[in-house]
Amino acid sequence: FPTRRSSDLMPLAIFLTLAGGLQDAYSYNCRGKVFANAQTGNIVLLGQNLAEGNWGVALHYLIPLLAFISGVYVAVRIQNLCKESEKIHWRQIVLVIQIILLFLVGLFPQSMNVPANAMMSFSCAMQVNAFRKFHGIPCATTMCIGNMRSATEMLCKYQVTGNQELKKK
């Protein structure tokens, strides 16, 4: 048996991070210029299209936002329902749901971009909610800006203090 939580394993962290980046690239480039993970981008594009009176286009950005909110909600519900389980960890359920949803998205034709993007945003939200830390250090497996900020901060603190522990973070 592993001595640490499987959610802290490096291969899983790498896989989740790559999957998060690929989901955004796929949804934006292949599914109608909508982000699966970068909800800030969707908020900006939603606001821009509302300001320009492009109501139909704006809806394409609102739906993934609502799906993201729903994904966080469902992940929290799964966590609460499974907190007493000794057989399966709630994060495993989240991963299984995510795999199923993303597999199904791959089967959707281009004419179904709106539900495909909603499912990807829902899936992303579940991942972001389930995998918040790696070795006790906060990280986001689907977004890079927070991780870039944290890495830069740790690098600067290490250079100032010389504290070897900061190099590990």
Where are these regions (language model features)?
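Short, small-residue-biased leader/transition segments that mark boundaries at the very start
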Residues: F1-S6
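Substrate-agnostic recognition of the 12-TM MFS/MFS-like secondary transporter fold
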Residues: G41-G47, G53, M120-K169
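C-terminal ends and interior cores of transmembrane alpha-helices
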Residues: I99-N113
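Hydrophobic/small/kink-forming positions within alpha-helical transmembrane segments
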Residues: L65, I69-Y73
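Cytoplasmic-side transmembrane-helix entry/capping segments in multi-pass membrane proteins
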Residues: K87-V96, A116-M119, A140-M143
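Pair of pore-lining "gating" transmembrane helices in MFS-fold secondary transporters
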Residues: D8-N37, G41
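Interfacial helix-start motif at the membrane-water boundary
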Residues: Q48-L65
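Helix-to-loop junctions at the C-terminal end of transmembrane segments
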Residues: V72-K87
